[in-house]
Amino acid sequence: MRGGSRHLSNEEDVSGCEDCIIISGTCSDQSSDPKTVPLTQVLEAVCTVENRGCRTSSQPSKRKASSLISYVQDLTGDGDEDRDGEVGGSSGSGTPVMPQLFCETRIPSKTPAPLSWQANTSASTPWLSPASPYPIIDLTDEDVIPQSISTPSVDWSQDSHQEGMDTTQVDAESRDGGNIEYQVSADKLLLSQSCILAAFYKLVPYRESIYRTLEKARVRAGKACPSSPGESLEDQLKPMLEWAHGGFKPTGIEGLKPNKKQPENKSRRRTTNDPAASESSPPKRLKTNSYGGKDRGEDEESREQMASDVTNNKGNLEDHCLSCGRKDPVSFHPLFEGGLCQSCRDRFLELFYMYDEDGYQSYCTVCCEGRELLLCSNTSCCRCFCVECLEVLVGAGTAEDVKLQEPWSCYMCLPQRCHGVLRRRKDWNMRLQDFFTTDPDLEEFEPPKLYPAIPAAKRRPIRVLSLFDGIATGYLVLKELGIKVEKYIASEVCAESIAVGTVKHEGQIKYVDDIRNITKEHIDEWGPFDLVIGGSPCNDLSCVNPVRKGLFEGTGRLFFEFYRLLNYSCPEEEDDRPFFWMFENVVAMEVGDKRDISRFLECNPVMIDAIKVSAAHRARYFWGNLPGMNRPVMASKNDKLELQDCLEFSRTAKLKKVQTITTKSNSIRQGKNQLFPVVMNGKDDVLWCTELERIFGFPEHYTDVSNMGRGARQKLLGRSWSVPVIRHLFAPLKDHFACE
């Protein structure tokens, strides 16, 4: 089914391709006479800023299939035609050579309904001619792992017309198995216009993408670049960049063409019209990633040897990295018997709690990579497993068997623990907690100062400074615990959040200026404080954001504002009064950012997932000196642990737990098929705002102020803390402060 076409926005232009590609083309001012424009060799690259889980607001790009990116050059000199079929102003033999980009990928659509309508309007969509004279230079790996027949890609040379040569066409398979086509002008996908040059100097994955692409071009061109063992990535890139900027001499463009003597890997270029593709399992059972798209040949050989040794009782799983097969791991695998090497462990810490928009993990549960992922069919499970892990660890042919099963229960749901050499740990839930809280690479800090419990007669009300207060979750929990609050100073810039706190707590909260404008004089005037809490925005820290700026740029820098005011609020050393603090942020952050935060706060975080005390997943890191922060999380009798407990009358839940609820409306839909979680009067329905509030632990209609709509209320809740988790952390404060 062919879909309609549309032009991508600027945001989509940046994320339209997963891999970096090289183009040797020419620069020209299209507004001037082409015959007077000098031909200048340039290096242009198209690359997402972050290879791991590229994601934008317009398309869930995590599921892009392994893209086939090509270089197309006009050698006819006849000029190109625009999207409307009209001949451009440049024609004749003097027409400069213009770069054309072709990218084929598989992207799930969020809106199946419009796709059906677009399918009826695509008859006039221009396509490339089968007899097109434009040579295609494929810069993808020849040894890439072939796609399965259920992950089709499109062969542009078989289904095209000559019109529209100046556009990049992306054929994307929608979630329901249909196809939708996008067209975008190639000059809008160039690095010089769509990417930030500073990213090359700041982001290692960006430089690695450039290096891998240049390395592929160098091998094809037979170019020898001098290198020595131990050279850094920057040192290896320098001569290759000079060669590329010089026009790929001496072979030039011809040297970038693939070797015709090598057989074509047809399984990697299977077309959507291939009858074998139509016989495969439903495409929405599969999920494809760009991360893990690197050559894993050596790792797979190592893992195959490991699996063979363990099967023949010649080796021990705990002596190998379960993800890559290397020996002498530095840590244990939290879910399955086996270890993890340093690089795989860091990847786990960053990506294990990263979820896609359908609620499933973004990467494989075993290796946190995966080119093609298989999703568990259990509605309460968010696990997925990659084809490579199933073939190596469970057994050859397992992946194909799994694709034919519907429903399929993953290896975390099946009662049987052992499947080949993939053996689930008996205590995996405790191991998972330890894995995220005991990092051997983190510094060992001195234990926080302990404050003895104060006799009831000497306790006084608590004084709180709340930074990035949100919707006053801290104040709400303190009141629910019965702790008397003498003053509650809150820094918040969101008008809707301030409205909720002001109305629901009847003016008991004093809202102050932006945190960046608060000085030591203000702290001295408002204080002293007994409790300082806060959680800076996670936009530039979360691995979900492909263009995140990290801890030291963008909103990530606001952490240092918390650190600054925390130091201002700390009592003098000779003052023995109890003083507590807590800082919260997302788990799916880079390991380096986590360690930097711990280094400044001089303590390691604890990881708490709200799934233990509520009906939704919400894993977060908490730093602080609150008493008993690392104690086990236990649900109380009043906690609503299942979705049904949170629903209104006559509404039935389809599942017991829901995935992480974010500020995006589609995060409410569950599972690989994006199902509605509730049934009412025989019809599927989304969660109502009051039900979302119960899931987070808030009272009914807590966010129902100032005529806010459903979307605005969900955004407030999506940025908030889980009330039962904060109650768990604040409960020991009852031994130090007066209670009602």
From Swiss-Prot:
Q: Where in the cell is it found?
A: Nucleus
Active-site positions, per UniProt? Answer: 538
Q: Which InterPro entries match?
A: ADD, C5_DNA_meth_AS, C5_MeTfrase, DNMT3_ADD_GATA1-like, DNMT3_ADD_PHD, SAM-dependent_MTases_sf, Znf_FYVE_PHD
**Annotated phenotype, changing residue 538 to A:** Loss of methyltransferase activity
Tissue-by-tissue expression: Specifically expressed in testis.
Q: Which residues form the ADD domain?
A: 309-441
Q: Where are the zinc fingers (PHD-type)?
A: 361-417
Q: Name one GO biological process term.
A: cell differentiation
Q: Keyword annotations for this protein?
A: Differentiation, DNA-binding, Metal-binding, Methyltransferase, Nucleus, Repressor, S-adenosyl-L-methionine, Spermatogenesis, Transferase, Zinc, Zinc-finger
Span list, region Disordered? 75-99, 248-312
**Could you tell me what this protein is called?**
DNA (cytosine-5)-methyltransferase 3C
Gene giving rise to this polypeptide? Dnmt3c
